[in-house]
Amino acid sequence: MRASLLLSVLRPAGPVAVGISLGFTLSLLSVTWVEEPCGPGPPQPGDSELPPRGNTNAARRPNSVQPGAEREKPGAGEGAGENWEPRVLPYHPAQPGQAAKKAVRTRYISTELGIRQRLLVAVLTSQTTLPTLGVAVNRTLGHRLERVVFLTGARGRRAPPGMAVVTLGEERPIGHLHLALRHLLEQHGDDFDWFFLVPDTTYTEAHGLARLTGHLSLASAAHLYLGRPQDFIGGEPTPGRYCHGGFGVLLSRMLLQQLRPHLEGCRNDIVSARPDEWLGRCILDATGVGCTGDHEGVHYSHLELSPGEPVQEGDPHFRSALTAHPVRDPVHMYQLHKAFARAELERTYQEIQELQWEIQNTSHLAVDGDQAAAWPVGIPAPSRPASRFEVLRWDYFTEQHAFSCADGSPRCPLRGADRADVADVLGTALEELNRRYHPALRLQKQQLVNGYRRFDPARGMEYTLDLQLEALTPQGGRRPLTRRVQLLRPLSRVEILPVPYVTEASRLTVLLPLAAAERDLAPGFLEAFATAALEPGDAAAALTLLLLYEPRQAQRVAHADVFAPVKAHVAELERRFPGARVPWLSVQTAAPSPLRLMDLLSKKHPLDTLFLLAGPDTVLTPDFLNRCRMHAISGWQAFFPMHFQAFHPAVAPPQGPGPPELGRDTGRFDRQAASEACFYNSDYVAARGRLAAASEQEEELLESLDVYELFLHFSSLHVLRAVEPALLQRYRAQTCSARLSEDLYHRCLQSVLEGLGSRTQLAMLLFEQEQGNST
């Protein structure tokens, strides 16, 4: 009874006891006993820094540290058995007035990382052939490779422009080559991976040379001497060969660096009649490397020209040649360049066709099947609009007219580049159709029925043409046809345009012509100028007022000056900011002409002055002032921003005081107005000079043109016209003066009408009025 009661009590604890026992057993089996003293004790004189040999087979207990490892810790001494403690390095601040030591860094990150350019071409020339063959080499080779240097012996009177010419001071061939190698090592030895030496009597195919050096690897070709191999002349047989200098020599940087200490010895010890043989013997004696024409599947191809025989462009040796030698004269050089360029162009077209075939053959493996390949093959697919506002618009055109004009008119004649573009597209379409249907049919264009084009930023300019054609058969039959064709003018490689350096620190002069009817707007303009320039302490901004008096107002200026409040506000502004000076000019005119007023202001300022022509409604901000400084470039560009004009308060949603809110329902960017402009005085003077020299009707044009049209028609500068979100103007009822020219009056009237409201808002307003009248 007692035994059964005891078993019933111990039965639940049985699995726990078995588990604990099994755990202890497994732990003892997995870890052997470690013979470790209680403490390290003092080291004996004969002890080594390694652990005792008797413990080599002993396993380290978990979370334990071997005594040998503790002794290996730097700075461990008598307390090596204790826990490790971090060593704190004290910070000693620099003494007051003592300049902190700056770290010396390289000028360019490529120098610090050891990044080098790929290829340098050194053209060995002379002062006699530099103006002829040297110029021809530069025109055919200079703009296609990274760096081309012309090495000549004697100094001439004047080097040809656009060429990097180095005078070595040695005319003898071997001495010239010796100094050329020294110059390359000293000036460019650490900047390039490959060096190509070639005389000016050799034509070099730039694309093939670039492909050759791009295929070679410095890891496997560290000591490479590549060219046309040739046996040494006379003497005992030599195991190596040298490279013929007439067909060019390619040297690796490592080989040149290894040759550096032996150049002087080679110059004194090696006797040779040819400079290329002298170089081959020097390289062979110093490095043991001989000339080779093949390296890891790369073959150095060359073409030896025969005098009086034309180049056979169909010859396989011609198509694969990297150099051609000898060249007789510059005309021969240009003829070779034309032939090689034609072969390179055909090779490029062939590669494009092969890539297109490969894309077509592999497109069916994609998830979408053949739909994955866009047309044309290899060009990005058309952009898919995310909303209806991003749909690209097709513009309709015919052979004579375009139905989408820059000035907003429904139809305008095709002129200039647009007309040439349409003619080129029609010619290309007809040529491609004849190529496809030849010789069964010969097609002739009758007329363009419909034409559509649009610009896709992802692809280029797309065209859809409906052509009325006449098909001619070889038997003399005729038949009218109408076909629709699609063409694409793809975008080429995107390039960064070089632009002169500009800075936000340029001094800016704001010009404000102010009529008597606009004098109430002057205080707001002056306060905006003070907020944008005077309060921040912008010393590079100035303001000049041009006060326009009518004849009657000018007669009463002594008794009742209409601009007296404006002058008082200017005086108060100068008292508030002691360093500020706001000059004004008074002009009496009945019909102010923009160009005549600008002529007067231009004469009062230096030629290097940067002008900001503003209107009384312009609200200046620091961002806009800096943008004006950055976008106006002397001798390069003039900036005409488009301000944001608020709609009529009765049409647009109501807004509070201050600048209007930038939105589609509150206003629009005024494309018709050009009241703000940023340009340099020198550019304006140059444009005015062209106007005076090119037109016999200067007086009439001075009355009919404004500054924007002056730069557009009589200046070679790039006119930048862009929206400016920092220029926000509230609505103001404007009246267009009847004294303006027809074009200026039309632009003013169009600006006033478009500034009332959007088409939707005006339509809703008319609808509400009609509903009110009907009831």
Swiss-Prot record:
GO terms for cellular component: cytosol; Golgi cisterna membrane; Golgi membrane; mitochondrial matrix. GO terms for molecular function: glucuronosyl-N-acetylgalactosaminyl-proteoglycan 4-beta-N-acetylgalactosaminyltransferase activity; metal ion binding; N-acetylgalactosaminyl-proteoglycan 3-beta-glucuronosyltransferase activity. Residues 1-15 are cytoplasmic. Residues 35-775 are lumenal. The keyword Nucleotide-binding does not apply. Highest activities are measured with Mn(2+). Can also utilize Co(2+). Belongs to the chondroitin N-acetylgalactosaminyltransferase family. This is Chondroitin sulfate synthase 2. It comes from Homo sapiens (Human). The gene is CHPF.
